[in-house]
A protein has these predicted regions:
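Basic, flexible Lys/Arg- and Gly-enriched helix-loop patches that mediate nucleic-acid binding at interfaces
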Residues: 2-244
Length: 244
């Protein structure tokens, strides 16, 4: 793939576009051992060797991040009124990142940020039914009958009959009248988890996604924090990609 030298360096987080242009003009950048002073010079990402101050800068076409999304942030690339999940990725200069799917504004938890469109498309395909598990606090005491309703596939409303889902009750707080649960769904309809609990006469008080396919949220990530995925985690997503 051919790209401009300044974009190459900015994508690899050497600096901002203006910062890397200054590095290039100061003759601190070499391509195939030759000093290059034109930021617009084309670089072959598959074959050229790029160095800054003698240090090699390899190119990675795709980036993958795990974000522990906080409430109050929207799952979008751009928004004129709200902070977006992309705004939280502070250490990356790439302009082509996007969230894989979405979490509601008031929902927390695991969200994948990438620029790999093919992987995202496959992971979100209705044909793949990639599992997603949520931790939630819901109003009232969840009965065994309601657990079975989820397991059998729940009629939610005229627009949605949910596929069978796994509902596990963790605890019940009788003083405050709420249940802590894990629920695993195999699709991702609009407000699906909230609508499912509304359909059984309950209400979601707090919602956090903790798994996406076989990938689990890193418990060391505080709300609003993120990190790059490991090679093993990327492989996990790729296995989900070819699943079913």
């Amino acid at each position: 793939m051919l790209i401009r030298l300044d974009k190459y360096l900015a994508d690899m987080q050497v600096g901002t576009r203006s910062e890397v242009k200054e590095l290039i003009r100061k003759k601190r950048v070499t391509v195939n051992d030759n000093i290059v002073t034109n930021p617009e010079s084309k670089i072959n990402t598959d074959g050229d060797s790029v160095n800054v101050d003698g240090n090699a800068v390899g190119y990675h076409e795709y980036e993958y991040f795990m974000l522990n999304k906080p409430a109050g942030v929207v799952s979008a690339t751009d928004d004129n009124t709200c902070t977006t999940v992309i705004d939280l990725i502070k250490t990356n200069n790439r302009k082509d990142l996007f969230p894989v799917g979405r979490l509601d504004k008031d929902t927390e938890g695991l969200l994948i940020i990438t620029n790999d469109g093919a992987m995202a498309h496959d992971l979100l395909s209705p044909k793949k039914h990639v599992d997603k598990t949520y931790y939630a606090k819901v109003k009232g005491k969840i009965s065994d009958m309601e657990v079975k309703q989820f397991a059998n596939g729940l009629f939610v409303d005229e627009e949605l009959t949910a596929l069978p889902a796994i509902l596990k009750v963790l605890s019940y707080n009788s003083d405050k009248d709420y249940s802590e649960i894990h629920v695993t769904i195999h699709e991702g309809k609009f407000h699906q988890v909230k609508r499912m609990f509304t359909a059984i006469g309950s209400e979601v008080l707090f919602l956090k996604r903790i798994t996406f396919g076989a990938l689990s949220l890193d418990e060391s990530l505080k709300t609003g924090e993120y990190r790059a995925l490991t090679k093993e985690e990327i492989s996990i997503l790729q296995r989900n990609q070819i699943k079913r």
